[in-house]
Amino acid sequence: MSVLYPDASRVEDAADTDIPVLYLLHGMNGNHHSWLKRTNVERILRNTNLIVVLPNTNNGFYTDTQYGYNYYTAIAEELPETLSRFFPNMTKKREKTFIAGLSMGGYGSMLLALKTNRFSHAASFSGALSFHDRDLENNDLEQPSFWKGIFGEIEDWTTSPYSLETAAKKFSDKKTKLWIWCGEQDFLYEANNFEVKELEKLGLDVTYTHSPGKHEWFYWERELEHFLQTLPIDFELEERLK
């Protein structure tokens, strides 16, 4: 895990400061360093009073896997308690707790937001939001054994315990603001279109944007900035002279 903590000048009194927190999730084959190495997130947030938590879940799709690594439980239950001991001035308020992620992490951010109701705002950038149209027994992403290790045997994704529709129906209080973006040239674009429609049918608060773009870091950094501008924090986009 990596943590970005705001500059001391942003925290006037550590004893009574209720600092907002953003959980920022990596994609497949990434880790807790990915956002730090591939984007300018540290510079972008240098003048913002915000704690950023970057956990590492390997390629576990932020689930409690079939092979015993309980990544979902770790982030949903254990990590907030651990962070509160290390950073006692980190907020415990839902309205100041946020989550976002790219690709696999986009799925993770939506799953965690819908199931825990811990986050007031959740974002997905090029998220792997649905596998309804993919044959996990025969695909070009990973071997069937990989998917079985994550999700087990699945006959119908939309009714499985791991679909976002199931999470929304069973657990969500529908108060979380969901912010979803995907590039129109991204291989996950159609999955995003499908999932957004399903979530909207269930009455969730979804803001969906799409624009020309591929499955690449340039777009994810840009969309992170756009998402940050929607949050109730003191973030200001840095001045960029042409």
Where are these regions (language model features)?
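Non-catalytic cap/lid and distal C-terminal segments of serine-dependent acyl enzymes
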Residues: M1-K242
